[in-house]
Amino acid sequence: MSKIVNGASLQPRSGLAPKQIVILLHGYGSSGSDLIALAPHWQDALPDALFLAPPAPQRCGTMSAGYQWWALSELNSSALAAGTASAAPAVTTFIDRKLEQYGLTDADLALVGFSQGTMMALHVGLRRSRPVSGIVGYSGMLTATTELEHKDFVKPPVLLVHGTADPVVPVAALQSAETELKRLGVPVTTHLSDGLGHNVDAVGLQLGRDFLVEALAQAR
């Protein structure tokens, strides 16, 4: 298992020790330095939150400056399920390490993902021993849910946001994820940004902000 190192971060605006942690998981070929750009849009509403955006443990083979949670050599459902499963232990270990470091619990934690990072956030977040406060997923998809029917899993609230013009991850992925999460009894809210490609827009940022504030408050 590859270890995830500390990456980009934004300390609590309050200047005090963190009372919450928001972990942002970037997309394929990107890095935490890119996704941490979301944090300043939310920091004023979550002044006691520590924002962490670690790099994935693998260098991206096709984009030498970026990182990947796993290699996207195949895009069928079984390959995606295997990929998320292979990368999950490193993410879980990173989460556990940070919660222990700051004396916090899963209720104090929110996960945010973009694209491949959304796949990781959903995979790991649904399989924690205790529910995180919430999961926000931008422009991603849900993988490997069949196994959940045969084991215990947690049901944190989920927000999924997707652009209708996404050329990388088709918008149908959101609709499929919503259907599957509802079938599993996971509370899910979705939003489609009309005309948006593989990106996060101002509406998505605001929705993420509002969701995180409510989720972290209600989890305590």
Whereabouts are the PLM-identified features?
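Serine-hydrolase catalytic machinery in alpha/beta-hydrolase-like enzymes
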Residues: 2-108
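Short N-terminal helix/helix-N-cap motif within the alpha/beta-hydrolase-1
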Residues: 32-33, 146, 201
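Short alpha-helix in the alpha/beta-hydrolase fold that links the catalytic acid
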Residues: 37-39, 170-180
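Short, proline-enriched alpha-helix->beta-strand connector loops that line the catalytic pocket
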Residues: 107, 153-158, 184-187
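Primarily recognizes the serine-hydrolase "nucleophile elbow" in alpha/beta-hydrolase
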Residues: 107-154
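Short beta-strand/loop motif that positions the catalytic acidic residue
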Residues: 160-162, 166
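Alpha/beta-hydrolase-fold catalytic nucleophile elbow
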Residues: 54-55, 112, 136-139, 161, ...
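C-terminal catalytic histidine-bearing segment of alpha/beta-hydrolase fold enzymes
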Residues: 175-220
